[in-house]
């Protein structure tokens, strides 16, 4: 398969003759085992990481290199209950490697404020925190994954064409095929476009507009429900309960 991929799909642009040190992939060991990347795909990921490292020499790229795969260190694959897909990382030093999350000292971004408003309106006893750190969700089995893992300062979507698409799609399809009874929360077109990767017979897929202020107020024409009022957080826990899985405490937001 590696030889076919190299010759047919990637036209021999990458060499798989040289082994890859798994530590250079920045992924947590459990994720390396779970994804079972072939030698060719490891080399392809390493090439992408090297490209990002070179870009950092001449421009500011978010998140920092040590946070690029932070999602894999916060949430073990066997613990996943819910997958929340973001787009590309925050700017202005806010990106932490977890979709929608920011460090406690950072101001809560507009999209996350919309998420907190939906939680406060739908989840009993939820109280909006003073910070935007979602690490505690990740520790409960909520995978907070951006579809594009890096972005150039001041240029939203600037790294969409670099090659992250194949890698994050591989992650999603691996979760779908290897795990059971997970909930996928897909908000906005870029996340919803990944729906074909998910086996809806094994998992619950919930879609809505993106929780950005404009979209969440219905300011954009869309075929998908508005984010405000989608009730996804309760629906996710209802599904987990039906399948005898531990629910997510959405209100547990420790700094």
Swiss-Prot record:
It is found in: Host nucleus. GO terms for biological process: base-excision repair, AP site formation via deaminated base removal. InterPro entries: UDG_fam1, Ura-DNA_Glyclase_AS, Uracil-DNA_glycosylase-like, Uracil-DNA_glycosylase-like_sf. The active site is at 88 (proton acceptor). Transmembrane segments: none annotated. Keywords: DNA damage, DNA repair, Host nucleus, Hydrolase. Its EC number is 3.2.2.27. It is an enzyme of class 3 (hydrolase). It catalyses: Hydrolyzes single-stranded DNA or mismatched double-stranded DNA and polynucleotides, releasing free uracil. The keyword DNA repair applies. GO terms for molecular function: uracil DNA N-glycosylase activity. Belongs to the uracil-DNA glycosylase (UDG) superfamily. UNG family. Excises uracil residues from the DNA which can arise as a result of misincorporation of dUMP residues by DNA polymerase or deamination of cytosines. Therefore may reduce deleterious uracil incorporation into the viral genome, particularly in terminally differentiated cells which lack DNA repair enzymes. This is Uracil-DNA glycosylase. The gene is ORF46.
